[in-house]
């Protein structure tokens, strides 16, 4: 009788899109998954575990708090028949908003640590981080007293999160390398940090440049041009930048990929130059066919 097929935690992470750190949290903290262990203590998952993970994801995508998922799984209820619980995501947004507006960096970091460990990152992007950023943008347009401090606090918290994820990725099996360069001269946006985080959680080693003022300078990377390059921009790109962009695309082995809301603005110019692009927010771009193809090519 053939033995049951098993998977490593890295295999499961790649198959389900759930980061290894999140899978461990679901096991240790919430008791949601019960993988077997090898003689050396390594986790091994079977197909039943993967089905459990899919069920957990379906509940989370309905807005159910991770702490309540175990009870729902035990009840045998189907998430398909459940109404979305948008209030839970609003609660998480408000907790983060309080940490920002009250300038409580420790509290803010703790909230982000908890969320990023216990909930799949792509789900957080769609239901927590992007909606919160829209709220913050409206607030900062009114320029309340000390709003620049809030902006710096929010940015520093994401610098910390990407560093944590980068260090974690260094310990995992290498999936591939890429470059990420932001053209936003006002500094890296939340969308940049979210895309950086998604790349790291996919297992890629990312060499990131958070503020590139001179695109021609990226030609210095040509010795490693086999590593794919993503150019990110939220704001309108200066017309003088398109010639250097075209030169970079020609220099790179498989061309370059442009991401960010600027791709919505300049899609006609990018198309005419033959430059691949993905528009929309980070979570939408990440789930696009173009990005999935790019990931497959990067990891081959």
Predicted segments, located by residue:
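C-terminal regulatory/effector modules of DNA-binding transcriptional regulators
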Residues: 159-300
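A generic secondary-structure micro-motif detector
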Residues: 12-13, 43-46, 184-185, 208
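A short, structure-level motif marking secondary-structure boundaries and short turns
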Residues: 7-9, 39-41, 81, 179-182, ...
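Polyanion-binding surface elements
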Residues: 2-22
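Long amphipathic alpha-helical segments
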Residues: 15, 20-24, 31-168
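Surface-exposed charge patches
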Residues: 11, 25, 197
């Amino acid at each position: 009788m053939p033995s049951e097929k098993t998977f490593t935690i890295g295999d499961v992470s790649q198959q389900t899109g759930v980061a290894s750190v999140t899978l461990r949290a679901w096991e240790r903290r919430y008791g949601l998954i019960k993988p077997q262990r090898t003689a050396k203590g390594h986790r091994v998952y079977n197909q039943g575990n993967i089905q459990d993970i899919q069920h957990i994801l379906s509940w989370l995508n309905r807005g159910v708090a991770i702490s309540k998922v175990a009870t729902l799984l035990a009840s045998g209820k189907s998430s398909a028949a459940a109404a979305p619980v948008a209030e839970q995501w609003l609660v998480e947004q408000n907790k983060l908003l309080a940490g920002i507006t009250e300038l409580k960096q420790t509290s803010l970091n703790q909230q982000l640590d908890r969320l990023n460990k216990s909930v799949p990152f792509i789900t957080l992007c769609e239901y927590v981080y992007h909606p919160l950023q829209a709220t913050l943008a409206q607030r900062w347009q009114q320029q309340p007293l000390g709003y620049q401090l809030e902006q710096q606090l929010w940015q520093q918290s994401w610098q910390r999160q990407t560093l944590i994820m980068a260090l974690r990725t260094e310990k995992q099996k290498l999936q591939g390398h890429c470059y990420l360069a932001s053209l936003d001269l006002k500094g890296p946006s939340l969308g940049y940090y979210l895309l950086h985080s998604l790349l790291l959680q996919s297992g890629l080693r990312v060499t990131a440049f958070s503020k590139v003022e001179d695109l021609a300078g990226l030609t210095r990377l040509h010795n490693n041009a086999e590593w794919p390059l993503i150019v990110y921009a939220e704001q309108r790109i200066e017309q003088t930048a398109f010639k250097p962009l075209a030169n970079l695309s020609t220099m790179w082995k498989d061309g370059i990929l442009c991401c960010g809301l600027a791709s919505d603005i300049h899609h006609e110019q990018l198309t005419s130059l033959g430059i691949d692009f993905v528009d929309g927010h980070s979570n939408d771009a990440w789930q696009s066919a173009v990005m999935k193809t790019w990931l497959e090519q990067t990891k081959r």
